[in-house]
Amino acid sequence: SLNLKDNGFNVIIGQRKNSRSWDKAIDDGWIEGENLFEIEEACKRGSIIQYLLSDAGQIQMWPTIKKYLTKGKTLYFSHGFGITYKEQTNIIPPSDIDVILVAPKGSGTSLRRLFVEGNGLNSSFAIYQDHTGNARDNVIALGIGVGSGYLFETTFKKEVYSDLTGERGTLMGAIQGLFAAQYDILRKKGHSPSEAFNETVEEATQSLYPLIAENGMDWMYANCSTTAQRGALDWWKKFRDAVYPVFEDLYDSVEKGEETRITIEANQKSDYRESLEKELDELRESEIWKTGKEVRKLRP
């Protein structure tokens, strides 16, 4: 919203009054009654409604939001979840509005930071419904407005399939699994926590990943030591072949809506927060990430 505002768009914010998000909006310079309103009032006033709640929040708020989606308005998503899995979310927009998507490939924090620096994140865009005939022009303008470095076209379905696969795969799930496996093996073989962490995580995140981001993995392979090069060339296909079936199972689970069912059912449980904290504590209290906390303190 700040990026759009700074790019000259007429933006109003809808938040629950007296919530942390409301207070943050005020801290960010939004003014109550001028460009900061409660959710229903903002939806009534807005011509393009950016529906940016969490997936669970979107399901909960949909009956409230839907009544303000009058003819000719635009409903904007940053994720294809609610629309793609409409049988489970019950998010079914009226037929006389535009429905579009811009999905930045990173967090809102990163998007804002890069925008302030004069840079941007890559984003996908999609059109689900074009009632007015202006959906394409609007989605591209909004994609640029939110701070996209470049835009590539997709569909709501492909966006959510790739996004859920990525989150459970190389972005978070798989990478944590690889980190944990290598760290545990090194510790089992007698390496110190510091050595195991540095060789597993610290060197990757602080040295190699930035170079890969800048130049590509092909460049990394061509510009490392001969020992590292030979080993990486010999082993990468073994890792690919080992995890390929896991990724096939993962994509099938996403495609069939199983991951959506699990997510929705988990969020609906009365003890979800308590159960979630136990799972997060398992990570927080694991030796690898306790060691990581200490290693980060030693960075220059």
Please annotate each region the language model reported.
Residues 188-300:
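NAD(P)-dependent Rossmann-like dehydrogenase/reductase catalytic/cofactor-binding core
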Residues 22, 42, 58, 193-197:
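Small-residue helix-packing motif on alpha-helices
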Residues 1-31:
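NAD(P)+-binding Rossmann beta1-loop-alpha1 motif at the extreme N-terminus of oxidoreductases
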Residues 16-17, 26-84, 92-107:
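Rossmann-like NAD(P)-binding element
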Residues 133-188, 194-212:
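Active-site-proximal catalytic alpha-helix in oxidoreductases
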Residues 2-10, 44-48, 121:
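Short, surface-exposed connector motifs at secondary-structure boundaries
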Residues 76-168:
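Rossmann-fold dinucleotide-binding core
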Residues 5, 26, 69, 144, ...:
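Anion (oxyanion) recognition and catalysis
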